[in-house]
Amino acid sequence: MRALRAGWLSFRRLHLAALIDDWRRTLLSAIGVALGVTVVLGVLILKSELVRPFDAFGPSLTHAADIGVVEVTPNISGRLPTETVNRLHAEVAGAEAVIPIVAALTPVDVAGGSHGFFLLGGSCQIELLVGSFNCEQRARDVQPAAGPGVPLQMPEAIAQRHGLRLGEEVRIPGLPPGSAHLGWTFPEFDRVEGINDGYVLLAPSTDIAASLLSSPGYATSAFVLPKPGADIAADVDRVIAGVATAGPPRPHLPAVFEGATQSLNLIALAGIIVGVLIAVNTILLAVEDRRAVMGTIGAIGAKPVGLFGGMLGEGAVVGLLGGLLGVPSGFLFGTYLLDRFGRSMLAGSGGTIAAHFTPNLIGIGAAAGIVCGIIAMVGPAARLLRDGPLASMASVGGVQRARKIPMWPLVVGVGLLAVAVVVLKIFERGSLPLNVGINGLTVALCGVVLVTVWIAPRGARLLIELLTFARPAVGRLLGADIRRYALLFAMSAALLAESTSLAIGSHAMQLLGTVQIAEQKAERLPDALLISAQSVLDQRDGRLSDSTFELVAGAADGRSVSSRWRSTISSGASSRLVVGVTPGDWYSQALYEPTDVPDGFWQGLREGEIGLSEIAASRLGVSTGDTVTLPTVEGPKQYRVAGIVRPQMVNDAAVGDILLASEGLARSDWAAARDQVAVAYPSAADATAHRDDFLDLGAGLWVYDNQEWRSVATNGITRFLEPFTIAGYVVMLAAGLSLLNVFVLGLVQRKRERAALRAIGVTSGQEQAVIVGNAGILGALVACLAVLGGVGSPTSGRWAHPCTTASRSNGVCCRFRCGQRWQPYSLSS
């Protein structure tokens, strides 16, 4: 205790007192850290709120259940056979209850508007998961209100909020008019408040919900509640072997959101890097002014380890202050991102989101700030320790000698870039998981920072030599300034280059992807109408029921009609999309292009073989003619690979790992549901003239001719990629503000130098020219490095091939002209 007390006393007198005495510089340093923390918190809020609706499938749904709940999730998404559920009931002796559910997030048209709901079907045993709401008594004693279709139930508070009365029709996209209505309401809103923000529709049974969601005979998942003290893991695993997996309840994220969260992680990391670099720059200036004092303290007997620890403590204090300052602005920034972009990213998904302030944000902000502050202080503190007290005492007045950037940042930076290139070249073929690609981008950004640190001062000297020919006095002063503050200049350039590269890369991907995807239908299916229950890149599994298809076929009036069927083999970020088509018809040939002989490929699909996208084949390690084992609704089966295909149009799931099969095989082995219908017309004008025939069916359909596809696809891809672009520019803005902070600190720091320069005849105009020249050279260097790092970085493409994105999970390729060559790049993960 005595040692701790002595250490605290020393820290308070030497370090805290210095921070308080120089409060202006301390505040500016903390503001710099707060800018980085603001970016981190804003992105983390967006990320957490985007995934919150998908907690409805697991964590939110089981909030009232006892500890030990096991969720059984099928290998084929949303397709847990009822036979498996029955076996769980019969063969898991230690289970108190087995609760199957059928659920989906879906937009619902209610009271003249559209809102996202969590459609949930199950027995009254659901009360064991969410808490009691008198389900059995209400089902027994209260008759549902009369209305069209099946009766559904929702919280009374939600019905009142939207002015929805009992008996009114509830329309779900993909179902014909008159399919469902509001039959009951219940007042126990607190039971479902955490599930999709309370926007829940309860179906009377799993069978009814399955019919609404085109999955009869299957449950979405099942929850097994163990008896007290019972261990059910082994029995559950035995029953579900080959069909499903078991574990604690977890969110069911769309595959594209797995990739989005990884990208948001990258932006959050960029915010941390910005915060560290901001703190490094501001703390460098603050420490330089106190080096002589600290050297004197060391010379009169202070232990070097104690001084080093005290300096790190100073960094932690400045970081803590900056982190706390960044919490309110971070929450406001996160709320803005959520309102501006989060809702558009979830449009059509059925998810409902809102910003939630939690005490955890304070802890995260404080922790991020402390990390920034400590990392920023390590360099100056280590140098103070390395130089010793005498050298530090001789540094009164600031930096006394030219600084040199060592060679190691260049060597390490180039090494990191080389590693990123190799990893992303492998990743681009699809054989590595998505998180490896994101980690590769992170490594590349770190490489950009280190290379910039080495290049910036040397590049500045070349530009200064040119300036010296025109303005000798200004050039010499500027050269001396850069040499003395080389590290500060290098870190400032690295800060701006890293943030600007992120912004340029994100914007390039958005612009290129938007233009190319908007023209896909006109190029592949110009004379057809595409009919779907969801918009382009809506994050849900849209479906067209059999009764809706009959309406569509009738409206087609004898024209050629073809369907696409879809299911998903679930494995998180590496989910595999199963697509069923009529092999070799006009629609399938427009969507998928075999790499080998087309006739042989389509014949193979007719005979029960499968096709794989290049990414799927790479991940499975197979080629044409090989046999591969794949999960099905009944367990693993073997299939012969008929060939490799290239997808030609973006799919709504934005997944490039695709298995192509005949319609019959997709329905029997993977329980695929119809998700899109194409109707052929003699011309594009004729197709446009018949759009209203399908819109008037009242089934909530999206009907695409060329112009509608161009408009909706542009909005879809923009709303999905724009948040990353804006976040990149926000990081860049934070970096720019931090440099303004550094310039202000620098002017305060060098007041003695400016007085000395005035004494030897330097005019105020020359001094101003030096400041402008410093900023101009910094801007010119950063512009060059950022363009190379943005257009050529893995954020918009592989580092070695500037036009090819590393996010190679979508099989759809767009093209970007580089010189005279066209390079493919895939749109999104």
Question: Where on the chain are the PLM-derived regions?
Answer:
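C-terminal transmembrane helical bundles of large multi-pass transporters
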Residues: 489, 493, 675-680, 691-812, ...
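Membrane transport/envelope proteins' first extracytoplasmic loop
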Residues: 2-273, 285-288, 344, 520-529, ...
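Alpha-helical transmembrane segments, especially those used as permease/efflux helices
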Residues: 1-28, 32, 214-215, 233, ...
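Alpha-helical transmembrane segments of multi-pass membrane proteins
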Residues: 16-24, 266, 305, 309-322, ...
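Juxtamembrane segments of multi-pass membrane proteins
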Residues: 63-79, 442, 448-606, 611-614, ...
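Interfacial "coupling" helices/loops that link adjacent transmembrane helices in transporter permeases
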Residues: 22, 277-319, 396, 738-780
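Alpha-helical transmembrane segments
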Residues: 26, 37-65, 261, 284, ...
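Small-residue-rich transmembrane alpha-helices
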Residues: 280-283, 316-348, 360-386, 415-429, ...
